Amino acid sequence: MYLLDTNILIYYSNGSIPPGFREDMDRILTESFRVSIITKLEYLGWSGFDSDSFDKAKEFVENAETINIDQDITDRTISLRREGGIRLADAVIAATAVSRQLTLVTRNDNDFINVPDISVLNPFKEDSGN
């Protein structure tokens, strides 16, 4: 089960997902399309969309299961912010992945290197893939 980070959604929308990961990405979108509410906000707030591509992006992300912030995610986010100095948005996304036991798919794996108990998949690294 996977949680997609904002950058992965943008790369997918732009057709920039690595060729070796496209089949996996299609499977994830079919079987396990989950995003944090923060990812949804960041993705739809991205300034790179024109009005037509924004409408397509909105329709695309509506197919995802959006995970809202609950008390467990709140508590984990606070701990990550206090102990790890991680940015708020990344802390919420990381806390969501850990709370729901999901593998976070992101290109920015270094942002999450100090997050305990997180599973991260970077499809842009040579040794990534399922």
Region locations from a protein language model:
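Acidic, PIN/NYN-like endoribonuclease modules and their adjacent C-terminal/linker elements
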Residues: M1, A94, V98-N130
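Short, well-structured N-terminal submotif of metal-dependent ribonuclease cores
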Residues: M1-V35, G45-K58, D127-N130
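A secondary-structure boundary/capping signal
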Residues: D5-T6, T39, N108
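A generic structural signal for short hydrophobic patches within well-formed alpha-helices
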Residues: L9, K40-Y43, T74, F112
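Active-site neighborhoods of divalent-metal-dependent phosphate/nucleic-acid chemistry enzymes
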Residues: P19, E65-N110
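General small-molecule cofactor/ligand-binding pocket signal
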Residues: R34, I67, L121
